[in-house]
Amino acid sequence: MIDIILPDGSVKQYKIGVTGQEIIQSLSISLFKKTIAVAVNNELMDLYIPIINTATVKAITIDSVQGIEILRHDTAHILAQAVKKLFPDTQVVIGPVIKDGFYYDFARDKPFTSKDLEIIEQEMQDIITKNDLIQREVWLRAKAIEFFKQQKEFYKVKLIEEIPESEEISIYRQGNFVDLCRGPHSPSTGYCAKYFKLTKVSGAYWRGNSKNESLQRIYGTAWGKKSDLDSYLHRLSEAQKRDHRKLGRELELFHFQDEAQGMPFWHSKGWTIFKIIKDYISCQIQRAGYIEVNTPMVLNQKLWEKSGHWEKFRENMFTLDTNAAEQDHNLIKDSIETKCALALKPMNCPGHIQIFNYTIKSYRDLPLRMAEFGSCHRYEPSGALYGLMRVRSFVQDDAHIFCTEDQITDETIKFCHLLKQVYQDFGFPEVKIKFSDRPEKRAGTDKIWDKAEQALIHAIQTLGEEYTINRGEGAFYGPKLEFILTDAIGREWQCGTLQVDFVLPERLNASYISSEGSKKRPVILHRAILGSFERFIGILIEHYSGKLPIWLAPIQVAVVSITDEAVNYAKQLHQELIDNNIRSTLDISNQKINYKIRNFFTAKVPLIAILGKKESESGKIAIRTLGSQEQHVISSSELIAHIRKNKK
């Protein structure tokens, strides 16, 4: 007999070789009906695997986070089985679980179509209804390689060859479909998600490398309840309507083109939004005691080597070959640039330390809060680029706080206050905080890490904020905080960060004179609120579905005339608004008023000032608000006051 320890701490005895299925059945039939797998000593296992030693056992139910992941993994395998039956010449590659769903990569010459997805979905339903057993088998490596070679599944052969010799080769069989997989899985295909949907097809590369073979990726989602699936599909539909790439084109905010992949062309309206946000942040940080600086966009390789970025970040840096340039132009051959490459900066921190080091600093100068709206460049594979959300050229609302170890808590508290106010102003009242502590591989002593971690936690607790812990997810140079926003359709976006850094001050020889007169290293707090302007603007566009609040709207008021008698009055009002720093546009064309209103509301202009003969004679304005059919009559001074009231 063996002891089985249950989640409530109780101990029951079972025969050696008892399965998780037998244990859960003996405890509760209702629990068993919801159980999809078991956790044995915190390791997920199939229900039918024998347990031969004393262990802790916990049921993994279909409504738990782990249960849903297993459900989605099952559905990915059913997708692969369906594709192999319908398109036998297709190779199946890999099919992991992702947030809210799963995908499976396939190697196939002919692209999958939307009609194909419908046929595949029906075949998947048939497989689920058939309720084939899902069985785990352990094969010899040679047998597995030979089997998949015969099946012409050459990607599976590559995967097996990469598995360490010390690991067993586990295979899952359901019906006549066999796949390489670690598991665990449900006992049969009938357990699998009856509530699923294949959502899209996209291109992919083997191993995510654009130099490798092209693949086709089918995405899907799966849920334990129909209501959950319906809710997710509604959010997905909303996300598609709000897609910033689509709205960016329609509203003429920005565009991308092949000649500058990953680098946006900002149109007038989009650049207006950019400048509004920049001016707002600049004002906020000035009030918070920051100095604003500007550092070179291009820096020499030697500095990047000293900072450590050349070693760790080289593949993501854009570099310039100055040797060739200088030889072509017969310039001086012994300059420092001829011996080293230049690189476009991927971040601002090394440049900020150069400014800090330029003059001797005293402990009285700390904390020193240094900010920059720095233009940065990072190489991202073309397949990873995604509108404004993933770019190669971007501007950060970056700042570095040079402080002592004893000042970390106070500076963190001040930063959190600033960050929350900014998010509130942009329409994100809820902020989640994640705290990431020391990783296994790290710089600095345990004593320094203890102090830094305690300082961050103390700051969060002083603010009364809830937080979650990401164990071991801190940077190698210090712990960090991440700040997550929730948008209008429930999606989470990580934007703000605060990272403690003990390493960079040492590498770049930053120091200050302590109260005892000795040289000491400052601590650097790397912090950002928005992250990159580009990504944050993309988030704003999707959050507001393009209908930006008055203070952010590139055009705040459209002044339109109904009749010729109102043209002069319209021109006069338009000029008055401009003189009061209100972003106004004027339409005195002969188009019908309904056409004008529709055009400006399609362009998401918050307010339309409608002027006819009556308004011209009375000196009043008929105002229509975006999304409303009602008109309100006000004066120009009231309109100006209303817009100013909304300014941040």
Swiss-Prot record:
Its EC number is 6.1.1.3. It catalyses: tRNA(Thr) + L-threonine + ATP = L-threonyl-tRNA(Thr) + AMP + diphosphate + H(+). Residues 243-549 are annotated as: Catalytic. InterPro entries: aa-tRNA-synt_IIb, aa-tRNA-synth_II, aa-tRNA-synth_II/BPL/LPL, Anticodon-bd, Anticodon-bd_dom_sf, Beta-grasp_dom_sf, TGS, TGS-like. PROSITE patterns: AA_TRNA_LIGASE_II, TGS. GO terms for biological process: threonyl-tRNA aminoacylation. Keywords: Aminoacyl-tRNA synthetase, ATP-binding, Cytoplasm, Ligase, Metal-binding, Nucleotide-binding, Protein biosynthesis, RNA-binding, tRNA-binding, Zinc. It is found in: Cytoplasm. It is an enzyme of class 6 (ligase). One of its GO terms (cellular component) is cytoplasm. Residues 1-61 form the TGS domain. GO terms for molecular function: ATP binding; metal ion binding; threonine-tRNA ligase activity; tRNA binding. Zn(2+) binds at C349, H400, H526. Its cofactor is Zn(2+). Belongs to the class-II aminoacyl-tRNA synthetase family. Catalyzes the attachment of threonine to tRNA(Thr) in a two-step reaction: L-threonine is first activated by ATP to form Thr-AMP and then transferred to the acceptor end of tRNA(Thr). Also edits incorrectly charged L-seryl-tRNA(Thr). Homodimer. This is Threonine--tRNA ligase.
